[in-house]
UniProtKB/Swiss-Prot annotation:
GO terms for molecular function: ATP binding; ATP hydrolysis activity; ATP-dependent DNA damage sensor activity; mismatched DNA binding. It comes from the Bacteria. The keyword DNA repair applies. It comes from Streptococcus thermophilus (strain ATCC BAA-250 / LMG 18311). PANTHER family: DNA MISMATCH REPAIR PROTEIN MLH, PMS, MUTL, DNA MISMATCH REPAIR PROTEIN MLH1. Belongs to the DNA mismatch repair MutL/HexB family. Gene3D superfamilies: 3.30.230.10, Histidine kinase-like ATPase, C-terminal domain, MutL, C-terminal domain, dimerisation subdomain, MutL, C-terminal domain, regulatory subdomain. One of its GO terms (biological process) is mismatch repair. This protein is involved in the repair of mismatches in DNA. It is required for dam-dependent methyl-directed DNA mismatch repair. May act as a 'molecular matchmaker', a protein that promotes the formation of a stable complex between two or more DNA-binding proteins in an ATP-dependent manner without itself being part of a final effector complex. This is DNA mismatch repair protein MutL. The gene is mutL. Residues 409-423 have a biased composition (Basic and acidic residues). Residues 393-423 are annotated as: Disordered.
Length: 647
């Protein structure tokens, strides 16, 4: 009796679904790509319970004829390719004919569609891949696909789904990438009836960037363009002053398809050269048009990995495009922004924005902000600050109408000598935290400061001889113990902000942070949703200096986004290490005598003054005996050959 049999089609589709449909975001990606291939200009994505309960995609594309609807659920049935030659000239996003039958096999699926020229449309209902009914229906041209009870017959897959907020963040990220890849399509994303994302579909990529990442970010993006006989590269990259803590803000597109490619990422970084700080990444949208014959997209189930011929030439093209665009820009950060931070708070902030200070719901509020920015709005220059007298008049005139300040991400000032905390290296981080927890109080010698070298090292003398102190490591230790005490046992005292801050994030980060907000609350940072992917901060803990608020809150949020699961205790410890490093004086910074002596006094009061939080030494000691040996005032006793002969 034969042992090898052909699997039933439904079972084969369920197996394929394991590769194609990883989570609700995979369903959104596949169905939206089909809608784009159908020539849609308007696509609406509606989800309930982050897509696990319901996903509905509505488009105004060409629709399907009645005879094609049932065929679309057959495996490898597609209108995209017809022969082997088409496989090497793929210009559509889908082509295998696997996605729709795979999705149907693990859900309850309803298709309502109508093609142009047909009297009636078609409604098809399927459960677990089996068609239950197909009837004519009156419906406009286009397609509406509803996926309900996803993974209902694959409980193991459903069991390992993440939280609703995490799954929703993945959906938002997919829609954002597709919006950047196809700015000519108007996208609308709704979750439980509330609008999360909407793009205008004008075809202007900068407008799409503004809609997804915010107007402030779009203003700091520069256009790139380059081409040769095989490739055409265009898009936008951020100025070096605008960076993020991870690569998630880099979008690489090939013929309208979002891909992941390490070497092309490397080319983007090379284009910046030394302009990027260590551990920081730019925001970039790189659109690559290529002859389909040079790209093989049939190498991965999700089609996000592409093999490219002449990849080195493409890397060089991207690198030169970015380098050339940055050379043409004025890369000196706007000094007015720094002046505004150091000048009188009310006089400068009162003219920076006119957003009303009010509570709003979790999602986009159309009455508060105009989502559809115009090219003129995006391109406009930042208006110069008004004079001091004008500011004073404005402050008096508007004292009854509070305003908010848009928080800005400061240029990264991490110390390359001490490196960057690797939050994903759990074993290394655990050892570091254990060492810091087990520190014992020790005595510290009395030191008399007498000089500084290269703005980096302090010289002091004591009974033990000469001491050389690394000023950055010393202050890092002082600040670490300060933050560890303030953050570890949080003082719940809060200071009300006269002018609240607005913190803007991408859609997916905004949703992820909502889920992790209790951790921020544990360190007395209370961010309230303000709509349009923005949080508002109305008060701050008294241990945090007001001038640190903008950078510190963004750094805290970036740390949360980089970690998957972390306890409150670990988060507080990591936060103390990060803030102590960021807030400490750096090398090549000259200290006056008073500041140097004060630093040594503070260092002597530390529980462990000998090492920075990363474990590096704070100071080294040369005893009087060491010095005398170096100058050969004391010489080692020489052993004679006669003495050696005795042994």
């Amino acid at each position: 009796m034969p042992k090898i049999i052909e699997l039933p089609e439904v079972l084969a589709n369920q197996i394929a679904a394991g590769e194609v449909v990883e989570r609700p975001a995979s369903v959104v990606k596949e169905l939206v790509e089909n809608a784009i291939d159908a020539g849609s200009t308007q696509i609406t994505i509606e989800v309930e319970e982050s897509g696990l309960s319901k996903i509905q995609i509505t488009d105004n594309g060409e629709g399907m004829a009645q005879a094609d609807v049932a065929m679309s659920l057959r495996r490898h049935a597609t209108s995209k390719i017809k022969n082997q030659g088409d496989l090497f000239r793929i210009r559509t996003l889908g082509f295998r004919g696997e996605a729709l039958p795979s999705i149907a096999s693990i859900s309850h699926l309803t298709i309502v569609t109508a093609a142009d020229g047909e009297v009636y449309g078609t409604k098809l209902v399927a459960k677990g891949g089996e068609i239950e009914s197909q009837d004519p229906i009156s419906t406009p041209v286009g397609t509406k696909i509803t996926v309900e009870n996803l993974f209902y017959n694959t409980p193991a897959r459903l069991k390992y789904m993440k939280s609703l907020q995490a799954e929703l963040a993945h959906i938002v990220d997919v829609v954002n990438r597709l919006s950047l890849a196809h700015p000519e399509v108007a996208f609308t994303l709704l979750n439980d009836g509330r609008q999360l994302t909407q793009t205008s579909g004008t075809g202007d990529l900068r407008q799409a960037i503004a809609g997804i990442y915010g107007l402030t970010t779009a203003k700091k993006m520069v256009e790139i363009s380059n081409s040769d006989l095989d490739f055409e590269v265009s898009g936008y990259v951020s100025l070096p002053e605008l960076t993020r803590a991870n690569r998630n803000y880099i979008t690489i597109l090939i013929n309208g398809r979002y891909i992941k490619n390490f070497l092309l990422n490397r080319a983007i970084f090379d284009g910046y050269g030394s302009k990027l700080m260590v551990g920081r990444f730019p925001i970039a949208v790189i659109d690559i048009q290529i002859d389909p014959y040079l790209a093989d997209v049939n190498v991965h189930p999700t089609k996000q990995e592409v093999r490219i011929s002449k990849e080195k030439e493409l890397m060089a093209l991207i690198k030169s495009a970015i380098a050339q665009s940055l050379r043409e820009q004025d890369l000196i950060p706007d000094a007015l922004e720094n002046l505004a931070k150091s000048s009188t708070r009310g006089a400068t902030r009162s003219v920076q924005t006119s957003l009303p200070l009010k509570q709003t719901n979790l999602y986009y509020d159309s009455s508060r902000n105009d989502f559809f920015v115009t090219p003129e709005t995006v391109q406009e220059d930042i208006k110069p600050l008004v004079s001091k007298s004008e500011s004073s008049v404005s402050l008096v005139a508007n004292k009854q109408q509070p305003t908010v300040k848009q928080a800005k991400r400061s240029a990264d000032d991490s110390d390359s000598e001490h490196g960057k905390l690797d939050y994903k290296n759990k074993s290394k981080l655990k050892r570091m935290l254990e060492n810091l927890t087990n520190e014992e109080t020790s005595t510290f010698p009395e030191l008399e400061f007498f000089g500084q070298m290269h703005g980096t090292y302090l010289f002091a003398q004591g009974q033990g001889g000469l001491y050389i102190i690394d000023q950055h490591a010393a202050q890092e230790r002082v600040k670490y113990e300060y933050y560890r005490e303030k953050i570890g046992v949080v003082d719940s005292s809060l200071q009300q902000l006269l002018v609240p801050y607005l913190f803007e994030f991408s859609g997916s980060d905004y949703i992820s942070l909502q889920e992790k907000m209790p951790l921020l609350n544990q360190v007395c940072i209370y961010l309230e949703p303000y709509g349009n992917n923005t949080f508002i901060l109305r008060e701050h803990p008294i241990w945090m200096k007001e001038e640190e608020i903008e950078s510190a809150v963004y750094e805290m949020c970036d740390m949360l986004l980089l970690t998957n699961e972390v306890s409150v205790k670990t988060y507080r410890a990591e936060l103390a290490i990060m803030m102590s490093c960021k807030r400490s004086i750096k090398a090549n910074h000259a200290l006056d005598d008073y500041s140097a002596r004060d630093l040594l006094v503070q260092l002597a009061q530390c529980k462990n003054p000998y090492n920075c939080p990363h474990g590096r030494p704070v100071l080294v000691n040369f005893t009087k005996s060491d010095m005398e040996k170096m100058f050969r005032r004391i010489q080692e006793n020489h052993t004679s050959l006669r003495d050696l002969g005795k042994y």
